Amino acid sequence: MEQVPPSANRDGADAPTVVDAIDDRQNAITAAADALRAGGLVVLPTDTVYGLAADAFHQKGTARIFAAKQRSRSLPLPVLVRSPKQLLGLCTDLPPAAERLMAAYWPGPLTLVVPAQPAMQWDLGRTEGTIGVRMPLDDITLDVIRQVGPLAVTSANTSGSPAARTIDEAISQLGDSVDVYVDGGPREGGAASTVVDLTRGTATILRGGDLDEDDVAAVAEGELDPLEAAARWAERAAT
């Protein structure tokens, strides 16, 4: 484990820890999970870019994300889950389009915006009764979610800056506002996830990504079989 030199904005707190998940995977997962349970911030590798994570149900942690990123609360935090089943506990009225899209693209670079359970004790920003949810295609982050539960995760950068594709890029932007950095090597994705809003009756693509938008729309409308869409995506991702 390495440490990032401390700076004044942590008021004398211990320097952040950098853990190599390639050489010591279990130690990295344990360090990340311990920090998250305590309300800390952790930078994790995902299948797109590096993400800045907090326990979704720890309000101190999610508040720290907004501060670290200098992010407006009008931009609510998305949540990462370990499975479609875990999503069912976070939302209401999951439409058939969501089932089809999850079958095609989960785990993977697709975020679904769905109606949130009103009784959830969390603070993800101004959600207006919705939640953005994704299941990442990254074993390290999925293992952390299995230990901690759903995570509030956004790109590991300050607002308006490029997303971090390496742990050094994340450190250069977020510094000692983070408790643990988990180094999983360079991220190949580069692009953020495709975001589809399913709260308006019809599927609406809010943000494009690496997924083919025509295929995403066709799956949502039931015009393209999810397995065919998954095969097309796998072929495209391999090239």
Regions found by a protein language model. Give the residues of each.
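Active-site-adjacent structural elements in enzyme catalytic cores
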Residues: M1-T239
